[in-house]
Amino acid sequence: MITGYSTPSAHVLMSSRAFKSSSYRAAAGQTQHYLARSSLPVVKNSWGSPPSPFNELPRVSRGVPLSYLSASSSLLLNGEQGSLSGTLPVLPVRRKTLLTPRASKDVPSSFRFPPMTKKPQWWWRTLACLPYLMPLHETWMYAETAYHLHPFLEDFEFLTYPFLGAIGRLPSWFLMAYFFVAYLGIVRRKEWPHFFRFHVVMGMLLEIALQVIGTVSKWMPLGVYWGKFGMHFWTAVAFAYLFTVLESIRCALAGMYADIPFVCDAAYIQIPYD
């Protein structure tokens, strides 16, 4: 009886264990199947673009302002999603300035002679003629080398020889010292009259231009410098420079500005603007 009773109970126990294991396996299989199905969109979203309310926003091209966004997207910008309108970068608008840049305040916009309200005193007019003695001296020396002008200038040597001899006896550094003192001490200082400073820098520019022409001509072959071309060239240069210097001296004595093309503009730009 005991063995007969124990046998069905053992069978029932084993069958119940088998039922529990089979039901557990079925439940585990259903759970795994459910988890696999539920995790599938997550895996897809991890490989693709994540579902976000920002994907619903319309794409705004570069340069389009934020006011063109739709009404539905404005809720995301100012609603409960975190106020994203403040996080979007807004580039500042550049305003074009109409002011023209200037290199220096001393450079005038146009080259015009100041109005002569009254005639300068006679001593200022006399001093304004002195800077032209240097280019006149150089012009006379180059004119004497010209074949056509030498016979004519020989009659006036007694007038020019004392001055030319005095200039020739000066030391070699005199011209350099003269230019530095005249430019820094007179031209660039506003204490002197504008009329006097203008004629000082005019004489300096005429002297420098003539020295440059003489230096460049010495680099030419001797056949050109002493030939027929050089003879006509120095005759033309001597006539042009002689009349230019004499016209400048006449304007200085008359109390006027010498209106020499190109040279007067170059002289006026060297003077600080008042």
Curated annotation (Swiss-Prot):
Subcellular location, principal: plastid
GO cellular component terms attached to this protein's record: chloroplast inner membrane
Family membership noted in the UniProt record: Belongs to the Tic20 family.
GN (gene name): TIC20-I
UniProt cross-references to PANTHER family, sorted A to Z: HIT-TYPE ZINC FINGER FAMILY PROTEIN-RELATED, PROTEIN TIC 20-II, CHLOROPLASTIC
Pfam family, one: TIC20
Presequence boundaries: 1-65
Subunit structure and binding partners: Part of the Tic complex. Component of the 1-MD complex, composed of TIC20-I, TIC214, TIC100 and TIC56. Interacts with the translocating preproteins. Hydrolysis of ATP is essential for the formation of this complex. The 1-MD complex interacts with TIC21.
Membrane topology: Multi-pass membrane protein
Biological process, per Gene Ontology: protein import into chloroplast stroma
Species: Arabidopsis thaliana (Mouse-ear cress)
Spans traversing the lipid bilayer: 130-152, 167-187, 200-220, 229-249
Localization per Swiss-Prot or TrEMBL: Plastid, Chloroplast inner membrane
GO molecular function terms listed in the Swiss-Prot or TrEMBL record: protein transmembrane transporter activity
Annotated InterPro entries: Tic20 (IPR005691)
Name this protein carries in UniProt: Protein TIC 20-I, chloroplastic
Domain of life, source organism: Eukaryota
Tissue specificity of this protein: Expressed in leaves, shoots and roots. High expression in mature photosynthetic tissues. Lower levels in non-photosynthetic tissues and roots.
Role according to the record: Involved in protein precursor import into chloroplasts. May be part of an intermediate translocation complex acting as a protein-conducting channel at the inner envelope. Seems to be specific for photosynthesis-related pre-proteins. Partially redundant with TIC20-IV, but not with TIC20-II or TIC20-V.
UniProt note: phenotype after gene disruption: Albino and seedling lethality. Tic20-I and tic20-IV double mutant is embryo lethal.
